[in-house]
Amino acid sequence: MSKEKFERTKPHVNVGTIGHVDHGKTTLTAAITTVLAKHFGGAARAFDQIDNAPEEKARGITINTSHVEYDTETRHYAHVDCPGHADYVKNMITGAAQMDGAILVVAATDGPMPQTREHILLGRQVGVPYIIVFLNKCDMVDDEELLELVEMEVRELLSQYDFPGDDTPIVRGSALQALNGVPEWEEKIIELAQHLDSYIPEPERAIDKPFLLPIEDVFSISGRGTVVTGRVERGIIKSGEEVEIVGIKETTKTTVTGVEMFRKLLDEGRAGENVGALLRGTKREEIERGQVLAKPGTITPHTDFESEVYVLSKEEGGRHTPFFKGYRPQFYFRTTDVTGTIELPEGVEMVMPGDNIKMTVSLIHPIAMDEGLRFAIREGGRTVGAGVVAKIIK
């Protein structure tokens, strides 16, 4: 069969496997690629190809992640699988692999285990919007009642963390048997793929979201006014549109009178492009790096929030010593550092390098933020942690 050219016509969706160690996440990943390659074309990936995950760096943090891709009838999927629990924690917190939905793998022989719970909690904290459950190793359980019990436990656990436990699709399967080509278990992989297609909605593309541009630089051009530059994070900006300048100071409104790229005037700037935006009647000293330009009413400035944080280990270039409550590092959002203080959960006295922890942060200046915004924690310009805004307080 000749190689077909890659069709970009199908919607692209990012997913990943999560769940307890040895419950079969990597075997399932291999089974999905193998079974779907048979049915819809594409490349099958062997277990050891996936398990031997290459190291990547995201925000200075080393993460082992395997990336595979596969097709269903209607979609193209990019799928991440991590070998170790620590890699999952880092991946989810840094957003290195943003997931539109996750496949939670639970071994029917064990039921939910500590990391099952932790991955669901992390999913909730970092904003994984949809979870589908694959109940694995069902070939090793003869007792229908036991399967029903495990299923009930998983649904309760999901509901506990505000996922719709009662409505979550659960597929009973055996990744190993499917990988070995046993037809009845291959069917279960097809069933899982159908749930991926129907249960996870098509993600909104960055370009369709409301306009946002983090300001990197501000210039004053004589006779023309003030220009801010940066990379458009989402949406589209057209000349003549009104925008808000949000963060650090009081929110103000202005009009974009021109958009340029490489000194050429454009009709519009789009998500992913580095542009300069000329602002009407705004003085150079009224704007600074760290603020954002945004479509009016779409983002607000905040100082206090709950976050989920991963603290770099000494080996990753992080701190060599723990920190305690009252710790005052810099929090790096988009383009700028803001000093903040932290509060630790009740009963937690200190945080060790290599830990992940829920902490409440209070910044000295407000920053334009939404839940799900990623940040780095820095001391004197060196990254010592990575986090995500889980819940805005004020």
UniProtKB/Swiss-Prot annotation:
Region (G1): 19-26
InterPro entries (UniProt xref): EF-Tu_GTP-bd, EF-Tu_GTPase, EFTu-like_2, EFTU_2, G_TR_CS, P-loop_NTPase, Small_GTP-bd, T_Tr_GTP-bd_dom
GO cellular component terms given for this protein: cytosol
Ranges where the record places region G4: 136-139
Keywords for the protein's UniProt record, in alphabetical order: Cytoplasm, Elongation factor, GTP-binding, Hydrolase, Magnesium, Metal-binding, Nucleotide-binding, Protein biosynthesis
Disulfide topology: none
EC number: 3.6.5.3
Region feature G5, mapped onto this chain: 174-176
Binding site for Mg(2+): 26
GO molecular function, one term: translation elongation factor activity
Cross-referenced Pfam families: GTP_EFTU (PF00009), GTP_EFTU_D2 (PF03144), GTP_EFTU_D3 (PF03143)
UniProt subcellular location: Cytoplasm
Keyword Cell cycle: no
Gene3D superfamilies: P-loop containing nucleotide triphosphate hydrolases (3.40.50.300), Translation factors (2.40.30.10)
Residues at which GTP binds: 19-26, 81-85, 136-139
Family: Belongs to the TRAFAC class translation factor GTPase superfamily. Classic translation factor GTPase family. EF-Tu/EF-1A subfamily.
Description of how the protein assembles with itself and partners: Monomer.
Identification of the protein by name: Elongation factor Tu
The gene coding this protein: tufA
